[in-house]
Each structure stands twice: as C-alpha cells, then as structure tokens.
Amino acid sequence: MSRKYFGTDGIRGRANGLITPELAMKVGQAAGLVFQRGEYRHRVVIGKDTRLSGYMIETALVAGFTSVGMDVLLLGPMPTPAVAMLTKSMRADLGVMISASHNLFEDNGIKLFGPLGFKLSDEVERQIEQLLDECLDKRLAASASLGRARRIDGVHDRYIEFAKRTLPRDLSLDGLRVVIDCANGAAYKVVPEALWELGADVISIGVEPDGFNINKECGSTAPEALSRKVREMRADIGIALDGDADRVILVDERGHVVDGDQLLAVIAQSWQEDGRLSKPGIVATVMSNLGLERFLEGHGIEMVRTPVGDRYVLEQMMTGGYNLGGEPSGHIILSDYATTGDGFVAALQVLAVVQKLGRPVSEVCHKFDPLPQILKNVRFRAGKPLDDADVKSAIRDGEQRLNGHGRLLIRPSGTEPVIRVMAEGDDRDVVEEVVDSICSALGEAAAAAA
C-alpha cells in the first residue's frame, strides 16, 4: 500500500494545509487504537517545538487520544530526542513530537515514537494510515473510559541529567566559551542550562521564540549568525541546533562551519581509539561525502551507506550492530545513549574530544578535505520527470563522466515535491557540468508536465 500521509520523518506539511486539526485528531485516534495493547490504562507523551500552530495541533491530538481512552502527558516545548527518551523512561505506550524540524514556522508535523523510544516501522505506520481513512466513531471509548490529560513538570531537568550522563563524570567544560544557537526552537531553555551546568561560559542566541521565528535565519540550516557571533565573542566553539534539536552543526573558533560528516569523523576516530565503537564501522547515508568514506577507510573503519533519512540509518545500525551513524545535515545517532538523532548529545561528544586533546576546534574538527559536491533541487508540480527520456539520457551521460572519480545521486524528496540532484568527484568542473545538465533536463520535463 502506498503511503498517503507518512513521509520519511512522520507526517509533515503546511499548518492548516495538510496538517489540520481534523487530521491531527484522527492521528491521535488511529495511533491510540494501534498502541492500545492489554487491559490497563494507556498513556502517550506529547512534546512540541515553538511554532504557533503547535497549540492547535497539540489540542487536536489530545482530543484524539483521550477519545479512544488514552491518558495524555503534555511536556511542552522539548527537543525531539528528549521526547523519545521520556517516552521510554515514563513507561508510555507512545510518544509524539509536534514539529517540522528545520522547516520554517508555516509548516508543522507529527512524529511518532514507540514505547521504547524508536520511530515507528513502516508496517506500524501503514496500520495507522489505514485507520486514518476509516470512520472510527464506533471504536471510541465509552464515557467512563475516556482518557485524561495533564501537563508534566520537571521534564527539563530529566533531559539535562540524561545529557550530562553521556560524558565522563570527571570531564568539565570549564574554560570553554560556547555560543549556542537554539534556532528559536524546542531546545531554547534546556540546552543553554545544561551547558552552564557542565561549566561552560555560555552565550545564547536563537532563544527568543515568538511562534514565527523558528529556524528563521538561525539554527543549523543558517549558521551564518552563529559564525558571526563566535568571531565577535572570541568563542572557542559554536553549536547550532535545528528547530527540534535532533540535528547539529558546529562552528570552529574561526567561524568555519563543521558539518555532520566531519562530526562523524571526529567521533568515529575518537571512539575507535578508546575502544568504544561496537565494531570497526559506522553508518552514513548516500549523501555523505566520499571524502569521509576515504578518511574512514584510511583508519580501518568501514562506512555503510543507507537511503537518506535518520530512520534508515538507525535501522542499519540496529541490524548491523553499529553504535554510530549519521547524516551530513547533522543527524548524529549514538545508539549507546539515544534511540534517535540527538544534536546536543552529539555536540557533547565532540566537546569531550576538544577538552581531552586541548587543541583548537579548527584542528580537532577538520579531519578530511571534502570532495567537491554540488546539490541542487528541481521543483515540480505534476508528472514524473525522472521517467522522461531526455532526463534518463542526461543521467546516463553523467554516470559515465563520473565513473571511477565520483558519485551521482538523484532522488525525490520524501517531504516535498522536489527532486534532489547531487554529484561529487575529484574534478569540480566536471561535477558542475553533470549537475547542470541533469537539472536542465529535469526542469524542461517538469515544465512540460505542469
């Protein structure tokens, strides 16, 4: 069965477009019915980021879950990885994060976690989707069996203690000046406080959410403001989270951006030296730079690639027995600690290496020179541009030109009507020509189908 609602990271779309109160309530009902197993009171924890539409969606989800007899524990603004962690620690049957991650405020989404804090499998999502298009009136709870909802206090402290426990007890961030950019999102309270408790000299930006400014010219997708602040304050490092704090990008003391591939290299090498890698390998996606793969090979570390999406990274980690994986966008999964990407915990692992080595971040976090890589998006309204004959011809030509000297990747986005074209190789001019040729053919095919 094709997926009508769920994309690569839950259900996501424009608030009051795809993501309406009606849909959110139905998601609550459907997910509640799927996860009611056994004759006991069932509970769901719900967190959110700082988007204006979060109130609307939260209220609708509460109506849906309580109408099928599930109790609801409301966490308020919390990072996605905190919701996953609290789902497990609070013995909930289900966890929900209301967020569109790195998107701007106009969008929102619903991410679901199972009782152990993992994102749902494709099969469970299909079960929920099937119920979304059914009339559930006859499956609602009796009046005396309706669920209750209440807000939970103290959850920030629980996440802070969890994050601090991922570092050795004798490791302090004393003497480290850190600029943290919380993207005006879910981590705006909890992460600066955690850094302060660890001893860092903390300078915070992106911590004044107003419902509209989440990810706006800030956070991991726009690290320019962080870069300027790091240089201005003569800081040692900058940390940029996205709106729900499941991804992270760093900035060194010179203001240079450190992406997820470099972070994977830093952590992988450190963990290998300390004997902490569960096996001599990590998991990355097809988007990770070939330079990372070559660096890891040079240190005896295998890199296994998956499709784009942290859920696929985690699946491969679990089936293959790996404890480190991630994406260049900054989704870093450390399965010794978390069941999903955790931007803050990943940043802490890098800070630990910096403190251990006593060297500048620019030296610690520049492990390899990335191969020239170009990524372009082609938007389309209708049709299937990838089936066009001219597009197929351009792709074949590109593969031949890069053969043995690079990679070519073309894939539709899982969250929007966009085709992503990525190429990388030793010769930048060739890479540019290949990408431009394919994008031109895709653009013409998309225009013809519109």
UniProtKB/Swiss-Prot annotation:
Molecular function terms, GO-annotated: magnesium ion binding; phosphoglucosamine mutase activity; phosphomannomutase activity
Keywords per UniProt: Isomerase, Magnesium, Metal-binding, Phosphoprotein
EC code(s) of this entry: 5.4.2.10
Record flagged with keyword Phosphoprotein: yes
Cofactor: how bound: Binds 1 Mg(2+) ion per subunit.
The record's account of how the chain is modified after translation: Activated by phosphorylation.
Post-translational modification Phosphoserine, affected residues: 101
Catalytic residue list: 101
Entry-linked HAMAP family: GlmM_B
NCBIfam families linked: glmM (TIGR01455), PRK10887.1 (NF008139)
Protein name: Phosphoglucosamine mutase
Organism: Rhodopseudomonas palustris (strain BisA53)
Phylogenetic lineage: Bacteria, Pseudomonadati, Pseudomonadota, Alphaproteobacteria, Hyphomicrobiales
Gene that produces this protein: glmM
